[in-house]
Amino acid sequence: MSLENVDPQIPEGVTVSAEDAELLKFLETSKPKIYVVGAGGSGCNTMARMHEMKIEGVKLIAANTDVQHLVKMRADKKILLGKKTTRGMGAGSNPTVGEAAAKESSEEIKASISDAMMVFITCGLGGGTGTGSAHVIAEQAKAAGALTIAVVTLPFASEGKIRLQNALEGLNKLRKFADTVIVIPNDKLLSIVPDLPLNTAFKVSDEVLAGAVKGIAELVTKAGLVNLDFADLRTILSSAGCAVVGIGEASIEAKPDQRALIAVDTAMNSPLLDVDITSANRALINVTGGDDMTLKEAELIVSEVSKRIDPSSHIIWGARVEKLAKKSSIRVLIVLAGAKFPNYELAAAATVAGRQQEAELDLDLLG
């Protein structure tokens, strides 16, 4: 039997036995059904970035109360939340309205993910639709039996106290239903790219969220040097609570014997790892690189991570050669769970107070 009748990943013209053909058919039907739901304006923007990335093996769903924004999205499915509640005019930055809209559309949400094995929910917490709908979507995903992972941002301190308070309330609701909530504080992104205009900073935020989802999903949807299956992923991410993500890359200029360490150091020292990493007791690691990446380098990265977190941690990892990766580059995605999380409300208050003090000092200098 030729490839085109069995599996598009087998080179054309290659034949397989009847037994292998049966196995390949079973593999195709047993692939985990993975969905990404972008909730609200920010979540849909992140989902749009994922569409550009062409994440393998996932279906993209855009869910929003703003019909004008929704119609511009490229997705496998679009859900206009709360047709009666908002009439397609948005939630007005009110999470209560966003929640009501999602509940009105709960049957459509349920039907869209009824066969899911894993559901990612992306949104920017703090606004109306994403904040209000994320936990409703998560509840439906859990009811369907899916491993439910939320990847969310917390607002910039400059967006104000009310938006932060909305975000924290939304986060608490989301944690009740999602297995894992990966939290990315936008203010931490500023420490990576401090001089970017706000609009560009939001795009960086989309890139980080999309990259996190891609890195996790493709651990099970793409073959690699070291493969993981869906059961491995569930072991680490089921009922994991809040988690953080670190991303690191060694440039092509790095020396071959140092690039693995540079990549893991960058990931483990990422400002996005906003926790005491020594207390983390679960880790998910995805290592990708060019065709000159070795298995030994991947193992070195895993070894370095294990040295820096709880010694009794449960670690799973995968490694894959990316055809489009820059030669001599290595990229590491690390998801850490089980660590003690900071009090975001106190941290944000301190940030605001610090900026206010800086402004007062500037005024004193002007005077």
Go through each PLM region and give its residues.
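Tubulin/FtsZ superfamily GTPase core signature
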Residues: 2-367
